[in-house]
Amino acid sequence: MRQNKLIEKITASQLRDDIPEFRAGDTVRVHARIVEGSRERIQMFEGVVIKRHGAGISATYTVRKISNGVGVERTFPVHSPRVDKIDVLRYGRVRRAKLYYLRERTGKATRIAERRRDN
């Protein structure tokens, strides 16, 4: 058995199937499990997905929000057990895969048009 096939078999059991479809430009709310000492709580992080990267078990996405006038970005693994759930709030219409240009924009310049979705 080739090494790639072995890795695929091992990681296939760890892939999550409850992840909704989302891409760059979409507004999401990520429910992340945070461990503080012996306590565990769920922290919500809501913002715009500025990029998705990779495939399979190593796939990640970065969410950006503005908190108290400061831009905050967090990168989450797509298939992480630390992410409780992902809610897609808005589907954005963008023409780029990576929205790094949002880092230089503030206020109304960061708005993204909504994408039509056929059910």
Swiss-Prot record:
MF annotations from Gene Ontology: structural constituent of ribosome
InterPro entries: Ribosomal_bL19, Ribosomal_bL19_CS, Ribosomal_bL19_sf, Translation_prot_SH3-like_sf
Transmembrane parts of this sequence: none
Coiled coil: none
A matching Pfam family: Ribosomal_L19
GO BP, sorted A to Z: translation
Chloroplast in keyword set: no
Keyword terms of this UniProt record: Ribonucleoprotein, Ribosomal protein
Function: This protein is located at the 30S-50S ribosomal subunit interface and may play a role in the structure and function of the aminoacyl-tRNA binding site.
Family classification: Belongs to the bacterial ribosomal protein bL19 family.
Name the record gives this protein: Large ribosomal subunit protein bL19
